[in-house]
From Swiss-Prot:
Its EC number is 5.1.1.1. Pathway: Amino-acid biosynthesis; D-alanine biosynthesis; D-alanine from L-alanine: step 1/1. PANTHER family: ALANINE RACEMASE, ALANINE RACEMASE, CATABOLIC-RELATED. Keywords: Isomerase, Pyridoxal phosphate. GO terms for biological process: D-alanine biosynthetic process; peptidoglycan biosynthetic process. It catalyses: L-alanine = D-alanine. The gene is alr. Catalyzes the interconversion of L-alanine and D-alanine. May also act on other amino acids. This is Alanine racemase.
């Protein structure tokens, strides 16, 4: 069966490196949404906890329930209120119209739209939002925003930072001891994080976004069969690849049903061991030169992202949660 190996030492190294940058593990919010970006939330949760992480963020209540035994604080980022929220969790308030839809006495973090224009309340409407929250039974415990272009060298990042500072100044007139967080993975290494803020880290905790970090995930497949592909013979659907000489090939147990982008046989898709995929990828398998019982498909998602003209996030989060994940 195909296998995902999670490098425990690399993950712990990354968290220590990030915590040093932030100042402490206590100011660190690990984002574990979408199965920890494909890495395996339940597998990584105890590692983060043992290092001192007490706050994580996830997408949904279902994701929160999977790891609630490990963390004191869990923020749910993409919740649609239904009136039966769990007091164990913290919920992001993404739209002011949601205030009356939440269960009473639920803890919330108010999302501020500082310029991304995706979710949140704009700074101009913050006073009105505060009035509604204060007249409700919700417990405002934090406020946050998300930077749209922290990884790009333009002025929008600084505009958003300034807008969030304005929002903090307003909300502090009405509430004390709120938890603020604005810096994400891309913003982490772009200067000093404000002393009154936590930092949300997503893909950076898994080794992407900074050259000083170590990749955590590697994907492996196992051999299903092997054969001699004779000169002039083709392999796979459509016969895209034809052998120029006799060669020993093998088929491995990983395909596009496992969450991989479908290789169409055009161009050279280099695998983790330096071999190239031969012919079109099938639903549950692919072929290449025989590489033994186990083959590394990739150790760095950037290589596949570049080949398929996408981002490393998409390569990783698509990995099927049914693929076994193990610590190494």
């Amino acid at each position: 069966m195909s296998l995902i190996k999670i490098d425990q030492k690399a993950y712990e190294y990354n968290l220590r490196h990030i915590a040093k940058k932030i100042g402490s593990f206590q100011r660190l919010i690990c984002v574990f949404k979408d199965n920890a970006y494909g890495h395996g939330a339940k597998l990584l949760a105890p590692l983060a906890k043992n290092l001192g992480v007490s706050f994580v963020a996830v997408k949904s209540e279902e994701e929160a329930q999977e790891i609630e035994e490990f963390f004191e604080n869990i923020l749910i980022l993409s919740h649609r209120p239904h009136g039966n929220e769990n007091s164990r969790f913290i919920y992001a308030l993404n739209d002011i119209s949601q205030v009356k839809k939440y269960k009473q006495d639920i803890k919330i973090h108010l999302k501020i739209d500082t310029g991304m224009h995706r979710n949140g309340i704009c700074v101009e409407n913050l006073e009105h939002a505060i009035d509604l929250i204060r007249s409700s039974d919700l417990k405002l415990t934090g406020m946050f925003t998300h930077f749209a272009s922290a990884d790009e060298m333009d002025g929008s990042f600084f505009v958003q930072k300034e807008n969030f500072q304005k929002a903090k100044k307003i909300v502090k007139k009405y509430f004390s001891n709120l938890l603020f967080h604005s810096h994400n993975s891309a913003a982490l290494f772009r200067g000093k994080i404000p002393e009154d803020e936590y930092c949300r880290v997503g893909l950076v905790q898994f080794g992407y976004g900074d050259s000083n970090l170590k990749k955590v995930l590697s994907l492996y497949a196992h051999r299903l069969s092997q054969r001699i592909l004779q000169k002039g013979q083709s392999i796979g659907y459509g016969g895209i690849f034809t052998a120029a000489k006799d060669m020993e090939v093998a088929t491995y147990d990983l395909g596009y049903a496992d969450g991989l982008f479908r290789y169409n046989g055009k161009g050279e898709l280099v695998l983790g061991n330096g071999k190239v995929m031969l012919g079109k990828m099938s639903m549950d398998s692919f072929s290449c030169e025989n590489s033994g019982e186990e083959i590394c498909v990739f150790k760095d998602a950037d290589i596949w992202a570049d080949f398929f003209h996408t981002i490393n996030y998409e390569i990783l989060v698509k990995l099927n949660p049914n693929i076994q994940r193990v610590l190494v």
